[in-house]
Amino acid sequence: MYEILSKETLAQSITKFVVRAPYVARKHKAGNFIILRVNDHGERIPLTIVDSDPKEGTITIIAQTIGKTTKLLSLQEKGDFLLDVAGPLGNPTPIHNYGTVVCIGGGVGTAEVYPIATALKNAGNKLITIVGARTKELVILEKELREISDEFNVTTDDGSYGMKGLVTNALDNYLKKDGSVKAVYAIGPIIMMKAVSEFTRPIGLSTFVSLNPIMMDGTGMCGACRVSIGKETKFACVDGPEFDGHQVDFEELMTRNRSYMDLEKVSLEAFDQELAGHRCKAEAKEAANA
């Protein structure tokens, strides 16, 4: 069992947890993830390790409420215990001193960018960070990323904060004034990673993306996380999660990731109804005892 030591709401439907997991904390490197299960009835979900403290034996994870399991996770509180935390899984991010590197985070993908950006900065790189979100309230980890970045940019779809537009617009602006960028790391919604990869392909700028397809065991046994990379089949959990963005078949990835969206929506709606029923019973009992 893994104790939740702290919980913080970062934005609507986005929650940060610090969890006691000594082994994972000791072994964690940037790019690693865990497979988490809240309880006996919960499904297994992959989450990136955002940070770790080997001395304290803790890891930090950030989850966005999308389906039933992430909703269940969001309801956990400080002092509660998670049933399973398996990891660290996946290959660590290869860290090099490129000179100048751009890290791009979209939505909750910003949480995955943070440990990689930190490692790249510690390796001596000039770090340019771009964070994109739909609106100001959904921008996360701004303070943390500003502290390690040589230049920090925000884009929002609605223009409520930073530059109105897409992360590719901000990337284009930066590349026009600095041609020394040697690599781009882009993590976020598939459509965003695809757009960044398509933007950098014609100019031959190395671009790395982190893929989070449907995943169950995290060890390559189930094959659910298979992705097409340069016409070869790879497994994101053991061959990734990071790949050359110019080699990823994003169309196939988007199709596969939509496979269970309808079922996920139905499951979440049923869970919300169940929670509402429990609240009604609790309120009725409280009223009866008043």
Q: Locations of the language-model features?
A:
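Structural signal for conserved beta-strand scaffold positions within catalytic alpha/beta enzyme cores
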Residues: 6, 51, 154-156, 209, ...
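A generic structural signal for residues embedded in beta-strands
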Residues: 36, 84-85, 227
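Short, surface-exposed secondary-structure boundary micro-motifs
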Residues: 39, 87-88, 230
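Local cysteine-cluster metal-coordination motifs and their immediate loop/turn environment
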Residues: 112, 190-191, 212-242, 275-284
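Short Fe-S-cluster ligation motifs
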Residues: 235-239, 243-290
